[in-house]
């Protein structure tokens, strides 16, 4: 199981890194353009042409691009990209936590290590037990069907790990940051990022989050690079600590 969890974690880290590259994509483009414009400008000024007429040089273009970066002129446009990055982060987290749950559930069942409370809750028929004994991967699918198991919100994730694996998840700041990310993901996908009463009510109970502590009705929720860093760090730390606990 340790090797499987390690691979799942490594894959998650790679997915997070791919989102990081997307977050930084605008800076990479800007740096690329500035580098080549400045190089061209130096060649025009100091090379054989010895051009000094601003009309033929790239000084104004360089200043304009540097101004965009300095004044954050395109922040509103970038925020759409950053919000979609948040959606990606939550999607990667959801799929990863589901894979971890499935891996541990299969291991515990196959090695007769399921907690007593979990055995009482699962309640399989004789036919289902026979099917699962032949293919332990079916156990999670049966739970999804019979118990309406879902990993689309943190509350259900916590209950699933406690009820079926006997694993208690710490309720701390990083968990609140992840809870908030899940709420924002739902808002971005279903309400075009505009804060409604249900969203604000749900977020008011997430008191220990480290980002966007002030929310207002009908305000558009826009993520920044630094806020995405908080979410990324919380998710990575959560996965690391959970894996260590499972490997115990």
Can you annotate each of these PLM segments?
Residues 55-184:
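Helix-loop junctions and short alpha-helical segments
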Residues 23, 44-47, 51, 129, ...:
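Short, flexible helical or helix-coil boundary motifs
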Residues 42-45, 107-127, 202-217:
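Charge-rich, acidic-biased intrinsically disordered regions
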